[in-house]
């Protein structure tokens, strides 16, 4: 299952059982400055970036990042020359995005637009604009009904455009409790869909097949799916601490994780998966 400590975050109105309020206001520092600064955060950003580049058209194509948080995934695309619109419902997270954006070159800043809106209202928020790529990473797992959001993702993609979704892998739910030696929880997790994340936020997982059906029914042809992280997860839950300042080690881990994300059986054991599809012609 995806967790807010490691991934993008959901619409506050759709979190399982949560209604109203910006619950991410109290988690933003830990989310932005903690999780993404860890080796796992660095690996996640690198692996997803490389996977995206295998499918995106060349810059300056337009990219919409729905639930994009502080821009950890889409700002590197802006640095690579893409025109990025980051949409997020949390004012606090958007403030974090602005702070990070100010540290980037002026040319990159001019390629980024920040919008405060729920993902379920994405099409209206962007005034009906269509994008060469629509990203939604770590959001679906916090919605009891993902269909309205998926509908918006697919509607915002241009014909031939890419839809990129990362969410929790329902077929790997036992990994975390087993690595934490919570054996009763691990046994129950084989058939579970819900869990409470490390920050106490509840969520659910999907299968690749289920999300593939969701986008296919909305005019987007599934193209390929990947894992995202595997070994780094096992190290963390096994109690191994890694130094994010050791750039050589982080790069070596990222290279291994990228290769594992493409291959069976490794990708099947990743606790999250990354599905990419392409919008069919109108």
Which functions belong to the PLM regions below?
Residues 2-59, 72, 76, 93-96, 162-190, ...:
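Conserved class I S-adenosyl-L-methionine
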Residues 135:
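A conserved beta-strand element that flanks and buttresses the S-adenosyl-L-methionine
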Residues 138-139:
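Short catalytic micro-motifs in class I SAM-dependent methyltransferases
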Residues 202-219, 225:
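Short alpha-helix
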Residues 224-282:
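Conserved Class I S-adenosyl-L-methionine
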Residues 64, 72-122:
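Class I SAM-dependent methyltransferase SAM/SAH-binding core
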Residues 147-162:
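A short glycine-rich, Lys/Arg-flanked "PGG" loop and its adjoining helix->strand segment in the class I
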């Amino acid at each position: 299952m995806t967790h807010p400590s490691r991934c993008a975050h959901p619409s506050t109105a759709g979190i399982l059982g949560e209604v109203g309020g910006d619950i991410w206001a109290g988690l933003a520092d830990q989310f932005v400055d903690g999780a993404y600064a860890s080796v796992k955060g660095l690996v996640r950003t690198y692996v997803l970036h490389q996977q995206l580049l295998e499918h995106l058209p060349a810059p300056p194509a337009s990219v919409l990042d729905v639930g994009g948080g502080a821009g950890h995934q889409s700002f590197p695309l802006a640095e690579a020359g893409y025109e990025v619109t980051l949409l997020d419902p949390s004012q606090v997270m958007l403030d974090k995005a602005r702070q990070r954006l100010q540290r980037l070159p002026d040319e990159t800043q001019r390629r980024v637009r920040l919008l405060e809106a729920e993902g379920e209202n994405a099409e209206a928020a962007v005034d009906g604009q269509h994008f060469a790529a629509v990203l939604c990473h770590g959001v679906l797992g916090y919605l009891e009904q993902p269909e309205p959001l998926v509908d918006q993702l697919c509607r915002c993609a241009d014909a031939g455009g890419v839809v990129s979704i990362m969410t929790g892998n329902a077929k790997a739910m036992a990994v975390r409790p087993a690595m934490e030696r919570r054996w009763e929880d691990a046994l129950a997790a084989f058939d579970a869909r819900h869990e409470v994340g490390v920050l106490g936020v509840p969520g659910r997982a999907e299968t690749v097949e289920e999300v593939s059906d969701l986008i296919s029914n909305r005019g987007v042809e599934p193209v390929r799916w990947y894992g995202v992280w595997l070994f780094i997860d096992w190290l963390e839950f096994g109690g191994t601490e890694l130094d994010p300042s050791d750039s050589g080690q982080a790069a070596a881990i990222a290279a291994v994780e990228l290769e594992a994300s493409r291959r069976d059986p490794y990708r099947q054991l990743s606790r999250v998966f990354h599905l990419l599809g392409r919008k069919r012609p109108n």
